[in-house]
Amino acid sequence: MLAAACSGAGPELRPGGNGPPNTSIAGIPAVSAADPALLGGMVLCVTGPGSAVITAIKPIHPTGAIEVVDYATRPNPGQTGGEQLGVESGTLRAYGFSANRTVNAQCGDGDSGQGDELGIAVSVPPGTNAGTTGWEIDYRIGDHAASTSFPLGAILCSTPSLHDKPCKHVWQQFGLHL
């Protein structure tokens, strides 16, 4: 009885699929407060009964200042033949996200794709460039607070081109070259 009580804290929020998601970094030019970058394709699921309410999202190992302007979840459109958000600009609402910040989908077996898609809107201060290796996602399931991460990196440049020298400098800070 004691072993069962100490064996875990209940369901958790985690990236969907079988094993950790592939690490990638997206480059996005012309990012500003007036035209935030949108990042999607991040499928999350709950490992047991319950719903996870996302309470905050922060960049992991950022270079420069990144502001998370908005975030929301929706049922994974890939499950019904639709397209995930990917990398865009504009608002999450324009791409079918509501103000929902709850993950209700239970994790499936293997690489089922079961889960809810997380979309994030981010910006950088005027005239600056920034980058991150991924996102720390804080959440609550009932009274249990925890965090998980998703390794979708982003290079966010206020310059009009990813090939502009200040933007290339951010890539180099992550050991990458265009």
Please report, for each region that a protein language model flagged, where it lies by residue.
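Sec-dependent bacterial lipoprotein signal peptides
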Residues: 1-4
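Non-catalytic macromolecular-recognition regions in eukaryotic signaling proteins
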Residues: 6-178
